[in-house]
Amino acid sequence: MSYITKQDKVIAEAIEREFQRQNSNIELIASENFVSEAVMEAQGSVLTNKYAEGYPGRRYYGGCEFVDVTESIAIDRAKALFGAEHVNVQPHSGSQANMAVYLVALEMGDTVLGMNLRHGGHLTHGAPVNFSGKFYNFVEYGVDKDTERINYDEVRKLALEHKPKLIVAGASAYSRTIDFKKFKEIADEVNAKLMVDMAHIAGLVAAGLHPNPVEYADFVTTTTHKTLRGPRGGMILCKEEYKKDIDKTIFPGIQGGPLEHVIAAKAVAFGEALENNFKTYQQQVVKNAKVLAEALINEGFRIVSGGTDNHLVAVDVKGSIGLTGKEAEETLDSVGITCNKNTIPFDQEKPFVTSGIRLGTPAATTRGFDEKAFEEVAKIISLALKNSKDEEKLQQAKERVAKLTAEYPLYQ
């Protein structure tokens, strides 16, 4: 920070305050994590200076021999992690990875089957406000009203009725194991291609704790942060037959020069994910999520689908204690717990209000939180939300958060 402090005190102060916020708060946003110092060092390296349009060995600029090394390593490590035939590590984000697949697999106006955003899908899976919903004819599938799990019979029925050219599996707020084999069977039945967006569960897949979609899907997209614990970015994994189309769609199709400093950071993160302790970490992520869900149930909260198989827990706060998701998010933030309001299946509230909150265990698990710590987290959440107008109780919750975060300091 010494160079930033000398050059730009305002930015240096903002960065320092953000570090203090991360260190003193319990981070429960399911899509966030804490990268290693090695990942941060790679992302802040001299590679940020290098333009490298093209791909390793096929660049439009000179002087790319060393970024060729880092990008090639990122590709090879990603292939090893997921067993993919081809990998493109250049997408700047998960959304751009999804866009590239759509451009390869679809024509404007084609029909696509994707998960309803309110049921746990993602903006890029056909939301009307997103490019995906504007450019393509998305038909939405959802979860069963009683079980709050994906209804594969409904997916099949919709596929047979609408004959989509592409089926999209994957979610941003779905806490159960996704059956990619069933999705593949449905896609084959209607002669559709299958794309899986595994952004949220990529780390679990890499560790063998969730079925690997690469075996079944024509295209797999992901972010490289979240459970994978790398820098913010995207990635596409596909079968060899789609290699040329995917690569030319990313560059020169929708992107120019790749962010080679970010790609180097991806390579470092993938290397970390190939180590044995990464599986141990992911196992703890899932254990902690199950403990968090069970402890909240014991505190009287209704958990969407009754529990979790992965890293996230969706809580129906409106149905449990009468608070909206927005009110719950603000209350928890006031005591040092960061989460996000989230719609739940069949939610009647607006997206900026919601009936639920989404909680995730990856970031706090990276800090070292174990099952006992997450039992305490659940009790603090309950104390704060059930006493959202009681300053004395909120202060007690705040003090308990401070005690927990002091036990598990960040980057120390």
Swiss-Prot record:
First-tier enzyme category under EC: transferase
InterPro entries per record: PyrdxlP-dep_Trfase (IPR015424), PyrdxlP-dep_Trfase_major (IPR015421), PyrdxlP-dep_Trfase_small (IPR015422), Ser_HO-MeTrfase (IPR001085), Ser_HO-MeTrfase-like (IPR049943), Ser_HO-MeTrfase_PLP_BS (IPR019798), SHMT-like_dom (IPR039429)
Keyword Hydrolase: no
Pathway in which this enzyme or protein is active: One-carbon metabolism; tetrahydrofolate interconversion; Amino-acid biosynthesis; glycine biosynthesis; glycine from L-serine: step 1/1
Record's keyword terms, sorted: Amino-acid biosynthesis, Cytoplasm, One-carbon metabolism, Pyridoxal phosphate, Transferase
Residue positions, PTM N6-(pyridoxal phosphate)lysine: K226
Main location: cytoplasm
One GO CC annotation: cytosol
rRNA processing as UniProt keyword: no
GO biological process: glycine biosynthetic process from serine; tetrahydrofolate interconversion
EC number(s) on file: 2.1.2.1
Binding site for (6S)-5,6,7,8-tetrahydrofolate: L117, G121, H122, L123
Catalysed reactions, semicolon-separated: (6R)-5,10-methylene-5,6,7,8-tetrahydrofolate + glycine + H2O = (6S)-5,6,7,8-tetrahydrofolate + L-serine
Pfam families associated with the record: SHMT
Compartments reported by the entry: Cytoplasm
Site positions (Plays an important role in substrate specificity): H225
Gene Ontology molecular function terms on file: glycine hydroxymethyltransferase activity; pyridoxal phosphate binding
Domain of life assignment: Bacteria
Cofactor(s) it depends on: pyridoxal 5'-phosphate
Family named by the database record: Belongs to the SHMT family.
UniProt subunit comment: Homodimer.
Role, per record: Catalyzes the reversible interconversion of serine and glycine with tetrahydrofolate (THF) serving as the one-carbon carrier. This reaction serves as the major source of one-carbon groups required for the biosynthesis of purines, thymidylate, methionine, and other important biomolecules. Also exhibits THF-independent aldolase activity toward beta-hydroxyamino acids, producing glycine and aldehydes, via a retro-aldol mechanism.
Protein name, entry field: Serine hydroxymethyltransferase
Native source organism of the sequence: Staphylococcus aureus (strain bovine RF122 / ET3-1)
Lineage per the UniProt record: Bacteria, Bacillati, Bacillota, Bacilli, Bacillales
